[in-house]
A protein has these predicted regions:
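Metal- or metallocofactor-binding catalytic centers and their adjacent structured scaffolds
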Residues: 42-120
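Non-catalytic terminal accessory/regulatory regions of metabolic enzymes
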Residues: 1-48, 67, 156, 165
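Metal-dependent enolase-superfamily TIM-barrel catalytic cores that perform enediolate-based chemistry
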Residues: 127-237
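Conserved, mostly hydrophobic/aromatic
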Residues: 3, 46, 70, 109, ...
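A cross-domain feature marking catalytic cores of carbohydrate-active enzymes
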Residues: 53, 99, 140-143, 168-170, ...
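N-terminal amphipathic alpha-helix/helix-capping segment at the start of soluble metabolic enzymes
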Residues: 2, 123-134, 343
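Shared catalytic-loop signature of beta/alpha-barrel
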Residues: 68, 207, 213, 221-243, ...
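Flexible C-terminal active-site loop/helix
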Residues: 2-18, 30-34, 109, 297-366
Length: 366
């Protein structure tokens, strides 16, 4: 089965009117829309697979990488020999970097190829990876609001929707405290600050965070590859640490884990190489007795990749990150079966669900 075509499809889906957010790693304050990049791979036998690259400000760069660097290396190759092909692509392109938009683009093509292989086998991807759970726990991952009243409202809405674990992206203590006050003692809170602090600053802030009772503090240090600093903060603060979203290679995940830097490891399938690389992290983490909590702050094939891999390879404490955005539309419409803090693993062939063609037509941009 030969790869006949690769198409990168950028989407821009607006937030619903009245939605407010603060500036963050993904965009400016009151971001009007969220950008995604889907990748469609077609074979000579007519099978189609879908992948996703991490989006936001990187969409244009990732699309360029797909169109000009990756597609020419993949078209005409065997779609079923995924890992050999992706290794060849990485070796050919490594001089342009091992992370960033190029890695996002490689991730999208890899996910699409796994979708094709599952469809060819007429089996859900989780079965190809070893079987597993029919349902998974999920947590609501909120945007950054900064204003305590907005944080309270978002926390309240997520709890009313049935979530028992929430992720904040706040960096100011009043907003973080407001979230805990609104949530009460029985809701789990995690805090992702997106790498803002030195080790000294993080130690000072960690003292203030001890009363918040966080399930984990995520990516507190700049630079994100300061694994020794994370290990020191983990030891001195007593707060569980999570990281891995911005780790791109298997070697660096081993360094992260060997440093004793984390209580939870967070590979991101739409950033670090797709399913081929993601599935290697679970046994690596098991050696270190560390749960895998995939980063999946997206709602397309990258999310489904995280769901299938976690269903097959995760542990009882693994959870799915569910982006809690108020958008005009979603890539899969209402097809994903969710209820409160649970999500059903799609059981169709491959990733189990294809993107809604009406959404693609309505929100595609150039």
């Amino acid at each position: 089965m030969i790869i006949a075509g690769i198409e990168a499809i950028p989407l821009r889906i607006p937030f619903k009117a009245g939605t407010k957010s603060d500036a963050s790693a993904w965009g400016d304050s009151n971001l009007p829309a969220t950008d995604s990049l889907l990748v469609k791979v077609t074979t000579d036998q007519g099978l189609v697979g879908w992948g996703e690259a991490f989006g936001f400000r990187a969409v244009a760069s990732a699309k360029l990488a797909v169109d000009q660097l990756i597609a020419p290396l993949c078209i005409g190759q065997d779609a079923t020999r995924i890992e050999l092909l992706m290794l060849a692509v990485q070796k050919k392109l490594h001089v342009f970097g091992r992370g960033g938009a190029l890695a996002f683009a490689i991730s999208a093509v890899d996910i699409a190829l796994w979708d094709i292989v599952g469809k060819a086998a007429n089996a859900p991807l989780c079965q190809l990876l070893g079987g597993g759970a029919a349902e998974l726990d999920r947590y609501a991952s909120l945007v950054r609001y900064s204003e305590p009243s907005l944080v309270r409202a978002a926390v309240r809405q997520a709890i009313e929707a049935g979530f028992r674990t929430l992720k904040l992206h706040e960096i100011e203590l009043p907003a973080i405290r407001a979230a805990r006050e609104e949530a009460g003692p029985d809701i789990e809170l995690t805090l992702d600050v997106n790498c803002p602090w030195t080790l000294y600053e993080a130690r000072q802030i960690a003292e203030e965070l001890k009363g918040i009772d966080l399930k984990w503090l995520e990516e507190p240090l700049w630079p994100p590859e300061n694994f020794d600093g994370l290990a020191e903060l983990r030891k001195s603060s007593g707060i569980p640490i999570a990281a891995g979203e911005n780790v791109y290679t298997l070697m660096d995940f081993e360094r992260l884990l060997a440093a004793g830097a984390v209580d939870f490891v967070q590979p991101s399938p739409a950033k670090m190489g797709g399913i081929s690389e993601l599935r290697k992290i679970f046994p690596l983490a098991a050696i270190h007795n560390i749960p895998v909590m995939p980063h999946s702050f997206y709602d397309g094939p990258g999310l489904l990749a995280a769901i299938h891999a976690t269903a097959a390879l995760g542990t009882d404490d693994s959870m799915i990150e569910w982006r809690w955005f108020d958008l005009e539309a979603t890539i899969y419409g209402d097809v994903l079966n969710t209820q409160g803090g649970r999500i059903s693993v799609p059981q169709g062939p491959g990733l189990g669900i294809d993107p809604d063609p009406d959404v693609i037509r309505a929100y595609r941009w150039k």
